[in-house]
Structure formats: C-alpha cells, structure tokens
C-alpha cells in the first residue's frame, strides 16, 4: 500500500493554488482540435471539490448567455494548464449546488476581505 501512495505522491501537481469552495477562478484548459492545440479560459465559481490525491476534481459554474454551464476538471490533469484565483469567496457550505436554482443577485457570493 505504501508503494501505491509513494507513486501517487510523485504525480500530484504542486504548481496549482489551493482552491476553496466559493472562489471565483479562471481555469486555463488545453483543448485539442484536430491537430492543433489551444488554451481555452473557463471562468466561474467553484461549487464543489471531490475526491483526494490523484482523483481530486473540482466543479466550476458560470452563466453563459443566460444558461448555466458547469465543467468538472481533474486537479492533476495535464489538460489543466493553470488556475488563477480571481477572488476568494465566503460560504458556509461544502457544496454550492443550491446556486443552480438561483438567478441574478441571489446567486452572488460574498467576497473574503484580507485583514491587514
């Protein structure tokens, strides 16, 4: 069992920031179209973190042209180029699935302010 954990720990990415529920982030994902590869930016709110280790994933939600769009990204995937945390959010739940039913200001998340 220790052999599996040691191999898994070698492959975990350490270059990504610590994500928390409610954060507004930009995910730079590599998209392959035929022979070309480009980077597509998907920005939205982190509504769920699942799993641990190599199998850890996060779900990002945004509103695009009035329609809610959610994407699930594996944290340790080579397809995720980088993640930028735009602003931190203050929430009191582990999963923000209730945001799916909310529209406009009701779906807003408070911003975490840094104390000086």
Curated annotation (Swiss-Prot):
PROSITE patterns: RIBOSOMAL_L19. Pfam families: Ribosomal_L19 (PF01245). InterPro entries: Ribosomal_bL19, Ribosomal_bL19_CS, Ribosomal_bL19_sf, Translation_prot_SH3-like_sf. It comes from the Bacteria. The keyword Ribonucleoprotein applies. GO terms for cellular component: cytosolic large ribosomal subunit. GO terms for molecular function: structural constituent of ribosome. The keyword Ribosomal protein applies. One of its GO terms (biological process) is translation. Keywords: Ribonucleoprotein, Ribosomal protein. NCBIfam families: rplS_bact (TIGR01024). This protein is located at the 30S-50S ribosomal subunit interface and may play a role in the structure and function of the aminoacyl-tRNA binding site. Belongs to the bacterial ribosomal protein bL19 family. PANTHER family: LARGE RIBOSOMAL SUBUNIT PROTEIN BL19M, RIBOSOMAL PROTEIN L19. This is Large ribosomal subunit protein bL19. It comes from Ruminiclostridium cellulolyticum (strain ATCC 35319 / DSM 5812 / JCM 6584 / H10). The gene is rplS.
């Amino acid at each position: 069992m220790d052999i599996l954990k040691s191999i898994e720990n070698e492959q975990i990415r350490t270059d990504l920031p610590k994500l928390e529920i409610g954060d507004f982030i930009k995910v730079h994902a590599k998209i392959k179209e035929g022979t070309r590869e480009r980077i597509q930016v998907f920005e939205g709110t982190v509504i769920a973190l699942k799993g641990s280790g190599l199998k850890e994933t996060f779900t990002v939600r945004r509103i695009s042209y009035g329609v809610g769009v959610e994407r699930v990204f594996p944290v340790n995937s080579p397809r995720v180029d980088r993640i930028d945390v735009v602003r931190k959010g203050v929430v009191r739940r582990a999963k923000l699935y209730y945001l799916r039913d909310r529209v406009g200001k009701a779906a807003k998340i408070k911003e975490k302010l840094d104390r000086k």
